[in-house]
Amino acid sequence: MTMSDGPDDGRRRRERESLADALTLSRSALGITTPNPPVGAVVLDPAGAVAGRGATEAPGGRHAEVVALDAAGDLARGGTLLVTLEPCDHQGRTGPCSARALAAGVARVVYAVRDPNPLAAGGAETLRRAGVDVARADDDEVAAAEQGPLRAWLHRQRSGRPYVTWKYAATLDGRVAAADGSSRWITGPESRHHVHGRRQEIDVVVVGSGTRAADDPSLTARSDDGAPTDRQPLRAVMGLTPVPPDAAVRGSDGRFRHLATRDPAEALAMLGDVQHVLVEGGPRLAGAFLAAGLVDEVEAYLAPIVLGDGRSAVQGAGVGTLTDAHGFEVRENATLGRDVYLRMTRRTA
């Protein structure tokens, strides 16, 4: 049964609006939930008014459903729980969300994505057997949830490795530096602001030894005034060259890793159970991940300038002829000041 199978157009409209709200809420959990999924949930009271909203807390904290149900209190009884991921049916550091929904007395549950984790799946069936009206979201909402904040977690569950995004900033002709090596700044402040926001949403930022030596980046997430933000990714340098003790990337918070390998697959394995890895540079590192078939997503920040010469955004991607090109589909585009932002995922067919 899907959400559209219900008889009430007004109810469907409210549920669609609430599920869209839950999807937005789930984004607020990005960067803090690993190894758990970033989930959003909304509770409607029996009259259809919003009674509670929530997103997944850090590991050991409450799941999104529990946050929303706690906020709703007695208003949840006889109401509807809408959630971006099937309620878990697993006792871990926290109890099953299916049991919490039953205890709250909800009459209906609508979820978007089926839980692919065999340890946690089954919440929908448990609720259904207990007499709760359970429905799956419509196909467009399922697709939005799967391509939204859950995409890295789902990829980790299905493939056994982290979701990898290659991010770069370049000119219209694909240059990341001029012939003299100058590169600050190719893109404008709006693009840089966007990048720092993205760093807060992922688990690890990786650069190669060459970029570390050339630019001495800190790889931190910063606000517009340069101050570090509350959410910080793990910072990693990949390559066999030792990272000096005074390198900016080391920082002082202990959130640094040296991945002493040239093999992208081995580097990902060294990172453990992280969900989302952001590969920021340089060209050889990007080429190595592309050649290994390990780039799932590309985020490009393109400045409206042409250099003609200089360093290319990628080198050694393992492509000898046009038919072997790495293909991607545009999922999102935006204008950031004078720049253009593109988010693309790997083409599967």
Identify the residue ranges that each predicted region occupies.
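Short, well-ordered, mixed-charge alpha-helical segments that flank or form enzyme active sites
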Residues: 90-92, 117-121, 143-147, 172-177, ...
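Enzymes that bind and transform nitrogen-containing heteroaromatic metabolites
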Residues: 2-36, 52-53, 71, 163-165, ...
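Zn2+-dependent cytidine deaminase-like catalytic core
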Residues: 42-144, 288-290
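Structural motif corresponding to alpha-helix initiation and N-cap regions
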Residues: 62, 94-95, 121, 143, ...
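Proteins enriched for Cys/Gly/acidic motifs involved in redox and nucleic-acid/cofactor modification
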Residues: 31-35, 61, 124, 135-169
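Active-site beta-strand termini and strand-to-loop segments that position acidic
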Residues: 45-46, 158-159, 345-347
